[in-house]
């Protein structure tokens, strides 16, 4: 799903629904890529040893492709503006235990939203004698 926000014209959003992980495990990874340039965020996800980074990288790559193909943004200027997750369904399973009892197994699902923004390069000030 691609949405272009109405307030700011240079935002691109990508949503990945039904990721098989809890929000508790996703949040630290998503907080780590916010504010970084896109290539640095992909590098960080590549070298992380968490299993869920593969799905987050897939969502980030989708957002980059949307920005490049649908909105003709330059990849070098893209920055991760927001990255957050939300709860989805929790699939419940039961495991047989001793004496006829059962233990509940929770299998949580989450959705991930990544918002990219195009950051224009600012002009560097020319250094004068007084300034």
Residue ranges with predicted function:
Residues 85-97:
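A short, conserved strand-capping beta-turn/loop at the end of a beta strand
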Residues 72-74, 95-97, 104-109:
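A generic structural micro-feature
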């Amino acid at each position: 799903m691609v949405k272009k926000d109405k307030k700011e014209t240079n935002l691109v959003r990508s949503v990945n629904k039904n990721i098989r992980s809890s929000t508790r495990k996703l949040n630290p990874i998503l907080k780590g890529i916010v504010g970084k340039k896109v290539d640095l965020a992909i590098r960080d996800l590549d070298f992380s040893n968490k299993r869920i980074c593969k799905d987050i990288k897939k969502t980030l790559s989708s957002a980059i492709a949307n920005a490049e193909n649908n909105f003709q943004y330059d990849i070098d200027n893209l920055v991760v503006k927001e990255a957050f997750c939300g709860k989805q369904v929790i699939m419940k399973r039961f495991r047989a235990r001793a004496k006829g009892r059962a233990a509940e197994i929770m299998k949580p699902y989450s959705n991930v939203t990544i918002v990219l923004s195009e950051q224009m390069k600012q002009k560097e000030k020319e250094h004068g004698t007084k300034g």
